[in-house]
Amino acid sequence: MSKFTEDKLEQAFIELLHEQEIIHQNGKELIRHESDVLLQEDLREYLATRYQSQNITESEIAQIIRTLENYPSSDLYDTNKTIMKLVSDGFIFKREDANEKDIYIELIDYETIENNHFKIVNQIEITGYEKRIPDGILYINGLPLVVFEFKSAIREEATIHDAYVQLTTRYKRDIPELFKYNAFCVISDGVNNKAGSFFSPYEFFYAWRKITGNEVDVDGIASMHSMVQGMFNQERLIDIIHNFIYMPDKSKKEEKIVCRYPQYYAAKKLYDNIRLHQKPHGDGKGGTYFGATGCGKSFTMLYLTRLLMKSVHFSSPTIVLITDRTDLDVQLSSQFSNAKSFIGDDGIVSVESREDLREKLRGRESGGVFLTTIHKFTEDIALLSDRANIICISDEAHRSQINLDQKVKTTKEGVKKTFGFAKYLHDSLPNATYVGFTGTPIDATLDVFGDVIYSYTMTESVRDEITVKIVYEGRAAKVLLDNNKLHEIEEYYEGGGDLAVLADIGFES
């Protein structure tokens, strides 16, 4: 049996990517300057074809390429953030001829996959401060968006952590230009296969264990197949780059969050289910997401919010994020208010009171992300909006956000009928679609929000090292008692608990 070396692992990935119709080219065959990290001819060809109808010129294409190359690698995080924004959201390009209309440029065609050029390149020599040869680089339209680094599983001294260090230390130091364009990285030894942000600590690299989201999660060699077929399916790959890589508006740390597979599949399936159940044609039950505690549900909400806000179908919806505790509200408010660029809406605000909520929602026709607590919905809240493009996303949807039933209370004034907070919420926004996130799904949750659309179990979370496993070990406590004392205690209880009995038998309390 032949050894599974790094070269063979590299070839295995190339073959699996080829099955996804990603063509292979050896880096030694490319005609390029050794310091170039862009495949300029691929990018030039894509832009010329895509914008031919707008009569884009060669000099304008050269200007776009020059603009990308001129971003400095010395400030790598900020440059990567800028370029990722250009890649994910596109940009307006001002024409050389002032009489020509500006062009909205997309570096990736997200609507028509066939218009993009996917290419996996190995053995490409890149000269920066030193010469380096990454194991693999996946290009889309000439942009080096994914970098692969492999280690052999049969070499005990080499691990995928070494691959991580190779990327984030040696390559970062010697060829930083490559990582200006990087969406994410993959480290693998064939058995352990993980993806993550170039700026993330090693522990935030994760496996991609499912292909479509419906299978049982896999491990070992099978996880290499699930990663390539799941993450590098062309449609999913550009969707991840488009909608599922989050960089905060402001950050003291170099934060870049690449979605994990449960976050991706949950957000996508919830989005589809919201469309299906949206009023007036649906029942307004957008679905329930069941996720293990600590599994990153808030990021799933963030990705879902971007999908909804960028959707043509929903026509710039209004999103209402509802929690049942002030600390959760503060946490979500902090996260979402720092994601205005990612979500694509500057109107992300925390609602301070019932009156504030009424003022912000009444008369609004579109847009806005409002964060509030369920307790602000009481019986004095009248109709706020009858629009159907309002989406209410509830966190901890198994608690106070499901109490729709009537309650009868007897007071000094007589019998009073009241309802739970959820009833007043639904009355205030009768045509909204409601989505529930919970770590404890109960029947009442499903009655209000609809069926579980996606679940990420505690077992899966532990396997992915998101949740730490806690094991209870039962033990019988060892108790040593003097037999004479036991006899004295028995006499005490036989005497009806009389303290005098204890005194008679000489028991010292």
Q: What are the residue ranges of the model-derived segments?
A:
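Residues immediately C-terminal
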Residues: 155, 328, 376, 399-402, ...
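Structural recognition of the conserved hydrophobic beta-strand(s) that form the central parallel beta-sheet
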Residues: 186-188, 370-372, 392-393, 433-438
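Conserved helicase motor
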Residues: 326, 348-358, 373-379
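SF2 helicase catalytic motif II
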Residues: 385-433
